[in-house]
């Protein structure tokens, strides 16, 4: 398959994946299409207890994953693109099971921030905004933070973003995502909130020497 929209729920922040869901998607005649009949959604066990903080978000209990296959048994399908809301988090999670997984990452969170800069950007808020607070949206959102529901809501938001940007193929979507992920302002440190182009050159030089520098921030700093 060419692309999947994927979401994970983890046992703790940046933890083991205990629920993984994905749905195949593609562009047909220039329109983003998802195959709802092919949704994958499974629970997995892990070697550590689910934190109560994580439990409060996704409502997955120890009893839900008892007797389930280990997360280590998961293998992502071969695909060229992987799409998700803050997709880097999900890629990190599934690589705990499948370290060799590789695909071009498309981040709907970055795209939403670019297209709707003045809105809240979590999936639930975006769905409410795009449906003008409809009852149908509320019905769907009440199940949000279930991985399966999250991929379906992400697909809904992404279809509208593609329409707003005139995107008609997956490679163009990827390129828009790459551009959207390059920050225009610094989000931490002594110059937090400052436009990248206005950061003093000595601070830029220092940042560029940091070993854990975000690759997209690095692009922004080099571009200036």
Question: What is the predicted function of each stretch?
Answer:
Residues 45, 49-50, 152-161:
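A short, hydrophobic secondary-structure junction motif
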Residues 83, 150, 154, 193:
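A residue-level signal for conserved active-site and pocket-lining positions in enzyme catalytic cores
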Residues 1-113, 117-145:
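Conserved non-catalytic scaffold segment of RNase H-like nuclease domains
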Residues 157-224:
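Acidic two-metal-ion nuclease catalytic site recognized across multiple nuclease folds
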Residues 88, 152-155, 201:
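Generic alpha-helical structural signal
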Residues 11, 146-157:
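Acidic, divalent-metal-coordinating active-site segment for phosphoryl/phosphodiester hydrolysis
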Residues 145-146, 196:
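Short amphipathic alpha-helical interaction segments
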